[in-house]
A protein has these predicted regions:
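Short amphipathic alpha-helix adjacent to the substrate-entry channel of hydrolases
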Residues: 106-125
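Short beta-strand element of the alpha/beta-hydrolase
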Residues: 87-98
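Catalytic active-site module of serine/aspartate enzymes centered on a nucleophile-bearing elbow/loop
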Residues: 302-325
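Short beta-strand/loop motif that positions the catalytic acidic residue
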Residues: 259-261
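Alpha/beta-hydrolase active-site loop
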Residues: 134-156, 313
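A glycine/proline-hinged amphipathic helix-loop "lid/cap" segment
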Residues: 1-73, 322-325
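Gly/Ser-rich "nucleophile elbow"/oxyanion-hole loop immediately N-terminal to the catalytic nucleophile
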Residues: 151-166, 186
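Hydrolase active-site cap/lid region
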Residues: 181-236
Length: 325
């Protein structure tokens, strides 16, 4: 692949040695196990003050008998808390990636610990319902339900309801901005910022980046089609703005945004198009394309470019939260 960064080449070589089949060739359970093998590292954990996991009640009209919605809260240590006055710790609500089918609280534990440690914020990871067991709009409704609950319970955390941001990667980036849309549409909470890492924003497969990277071993067109087929309930769901936020009638009133894309990613063009639409709607937007990198690169901290992107996000969130990061 022309102009692929040497680090990305090394990553593909390493993943290739594991002989993991593409998601589209697996069952949902098999795809979940494969992602856990790749992302759950056995190295030393990033230290934070405390990690708690607890359930919240799903919305009464969800019609789902699967039980409560689990949240995992990463609390900063005393040094991190020292960045903020009492009762003013900011909150980052994080939605993991995985095509709405795979990924979980553990696959993205390292990234949540990183943001908590670097920012001194509370990071709340959302264990939303996954497809195909729970198709659209289950994940979208869970995304907003978690955000609303956090906004209503900030005193529980000693946090500030005025400094909440959302973030997510890939399908989680989709859910982060969908939660922001729902917060705008349904009366809050107000958000300071949204961080969208190579987000899926449109149920379409005809962009230049899809054509150029259709067979990319990190994320292919076939895999994205497989994800969407599992996620959507019916033929018209893909046009709903809570599934395809790029198709929202307007994006006015959304929080400022940082959109990260990767040069060798089928989702690059739709991420860029969404950043352009946000900016066109008057939303303060920063778009950074990491040319030569692959989808999901930020989840691999051994990559220098991943750490550059992480530092960019930390700086942007620090400014949004009223602190240098």
């Amino acid at each position: 692949m022309a102009d692929l960064h040497p680090e990305a080449t090394e990553l593909l070589d390493e993943l290739g040695r594991r002989n993991l089949p593409p998601s589209a060739a697996l069952s949902p359970a098999g795809a979940r196990a494969a992602l856990r093998e790749v992302l759950i590292e056995r190295g030393p954990e990033i230290e934070v003050g405390r990690v708690r996991q607890f359930p919240i009640e799903r919305p009464g009209d969800s019609g789902d008998p699967s039980g409560d919605l689990a949240l995992r809260c990463y609390e900063p240590d005393e040094d991190g808390r020292g960045n903020w006055a009492d009762g003013s710790i900011p909150i980052l609500v994080y939605y993991h990636g995985g095509g709405w089918v795979r990924g979980d609280l553990d696959t993205h534990d390292e990234l949540c610990r990183y943001f908590t440690s670097e920012l001194g914020c509370l990071t709340v990871a959302v264990d939303y319902r996954r497809a195909p067991e729970h198709s659209f709009p289950a994940a979208a409704e869970d995304a907003y339900a978690a955000l609303r609950w956090v906004g209503e319970h900030t005193p529980v955390f000693g946090a500030d309801s005025r400094t909440i941001a959302v973030a997510g990667d890939s399908a989680g980036g989709n859910l982060a901005t969908v939660a922001a849309l729902a917060a705008r549409d349904r009366g809050g909470p107000d958000l300071r910022h949204q961080v969208l890492l190579y987000p899926a924003t449109d149920h379409a497969f005809d962009t230049d980046s899809y054509d150029a990277h259709a067979e990319n071993p990190m994320l292919s067109r076939a895999t994205m089609e497989w994800y969407w087929e599992h996620y959507l309930s019916g033929a018209f769901d893909g046009a709903h703005p809570y599934a395809s936020p790029l198709r929202a009638r307007d994006l006015d009133g959304l929080p400022s945004a940082t959109v990260i894309t990767a040069g060798h990613d089928p989702l690059r063009d739709e991420g860029e198009a969404y950043a352009d639409r946000l900016a066109g709607a008057g939303v303060e937007t920063t778009h950074a394309d990491y040319g030569g990198m692959l989808h999901a690169f930020v989840s691999f901290p051994a990559l220098e470019r991943a750490n550059e992107a992480r530092e960019q996000v930390v700086g942007t969130l620090g400014e949004a939260f009223g602190n240098g990061g």
